[in-house]
């Protein structure tokens, strides 16, 4: 049986004990592979992705235990975490009071009472996608059924930047979507459509002005930044306060 070496810890691995990566390097399943969350796709990852994710989990688990977990049972409504349970894997916890959210995987010990929680922690402001998705699967009886998911996508994130939360159906997804839309101040209702349209049109005009300036050579960095910021605010909401809250905490956890 062919033997290889774990690119992280140097352990000798074979086709059974090793995990092949997209760049044809290997990591050991027993130690290094277990440091990754189940939602992380190791097959399509290269070594840099894996090491970034392992560091992400180490840092995230520490922040979860020290900052967010104590808020899970808080009696203060302003501090209490919002939880989106996921029957297909880790749960998503959102903490507007800290500007952070966490994807938490619970691992249970076999034959021993107890469990451990491992987490990736993100700035809420970096959440740039929460889209509805369905998947046709066959159940244990061989009958086809539909699974419903919310696909979560984070910007400016190394390691695990996207994962799926299984929801009970489209109504449950709509509730999740409304929660984040409200949190970000994104208006999607018919009553606010005119106001929202005006904001987006102003953003587009700012971008158009930037394009015109680029064409005649008069575009400066300040104007370009304002144009990009205008589109972001109109489409994704103003996240300035969430960024400030999150960065104040993350400064204590360099990584």
Regions found by a protein language model. Give the residues of each.
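Glycine-centered tight beta-turn/hairpin loop motif at sheet-sheet or coil-to-beta transitions
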Residues: 85-89, 115-117, 156-160
């Amino acid at each position: 049986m062919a033997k290889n070496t774990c690119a992280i810890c140097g352990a000798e691995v074979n086709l059974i004990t090793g995990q092949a990566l997209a760049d044809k390097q290997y990591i050991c399943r027993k130690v290094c592979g277990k440091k990754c969350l189940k939602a992380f796709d190791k097959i399509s990852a290269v070594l840099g992705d894996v090491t970034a994710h392992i560091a992400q989990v180490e840092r995230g688990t520490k922040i979860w235990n020290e900052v967010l977990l104590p808020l899970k049972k808080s009696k203060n409504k302003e501090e209490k975490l919002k939880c989106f349970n996921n029957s297909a894997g880790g749960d998503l916890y959102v903490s507007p009071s800290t500007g952070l959210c966490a994807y938490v995987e619970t691992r249970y010990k076999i034959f021993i009472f107890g469990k451990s929680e491992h987490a990736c922690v993100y700035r809420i402001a970096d959440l740039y996608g929460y889209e509805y998705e369905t998947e046709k699967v066959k159940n244990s009886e061989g009958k086809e059924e539909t699974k419903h998911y919310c696909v979560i996508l984070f910007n400016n994130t190394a390691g695990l930047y996207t994962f799926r939360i299984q929801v009970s159906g489209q109504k449950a997804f709509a509730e999740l979507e409304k929660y984040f839309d409200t949190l970000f101040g994104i208006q999607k209702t018919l009553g606010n459509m005119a106001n929202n349209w005006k904001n987006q049109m102003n953003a587009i005009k700012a971008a158009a002005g930037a394009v015109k300036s680029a064409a005649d050579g008069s575009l400066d960095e300040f104007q370009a930044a304002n144009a990009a910021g205008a589109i972001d605010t109109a489409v994704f909401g103003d996240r300035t306060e969430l960024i400030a809250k999150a960065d104040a905490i993350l400064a204590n956890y360099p990584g």
